[in-house]
UniProtKB/Swiss-Prot annotation:
Name this polypeptide is given: Probable deoxyuridine 5'-triphosphate nucleotidohydrolase
Organism: Schizosaccharomyces pombe (strain 972 / ATCC 24843) (Fission yeast)
Swiss-Prot/TrEMBL GO biological process terms: dITP catabolic process; dUMP biosynthetic process; dUTP catabolic process
UniProt-listed PANTHER family: DEOXYURIDINE 5'-TRIPHOSPHATE NUCLEOTIDOHYDROLASE
EC number annotated for this UniProt entry: 3.6.1.23
Subunit structure: Homotrimer.
GO cellular component: cytosol; nucleus
Source organism, top-level taxon: Eukaryota
Amino acid sequence: MSFFVQKLSEKATIPTKGSANSAGYDLYAAAECIVPRRGKVLVDTDLAIAVPEGTYGRVAPRSGLASKHSIDTGAGVIDADYRGHVRVLLFNYSDVDFPIKVGDRIAQLILERIVNPPVILVESLEATVRGANGFGSTGV
């Protein structure tokens, strides 16, 4: 199984894996920008991708950026039929601006399988021990 990548500019970097067993492919910035403190920014990758049918690409944070700089990702779903420019939404939860340079690893792309069962309308759902008990109901 492969996925296809198109470079939209010379500044784009093809996704890479940190090791053979890495779950994700590193995504790289194609433009300089600042992730403002307590703010967000869309970072260009200058890539278009085609993930295999039956999968989607999930844009996930890089653990080092999250743990050392409080940088997180958001809105990170790339559908199998999307062919547009891939941008990464980064959030900065710290109190200092975070600079991004061309070629910086900014996120990771994880390919995940999709299950698409039919939606069935029912009058009520089958009862369970948990029932409708929500947040914190199974412990902290």
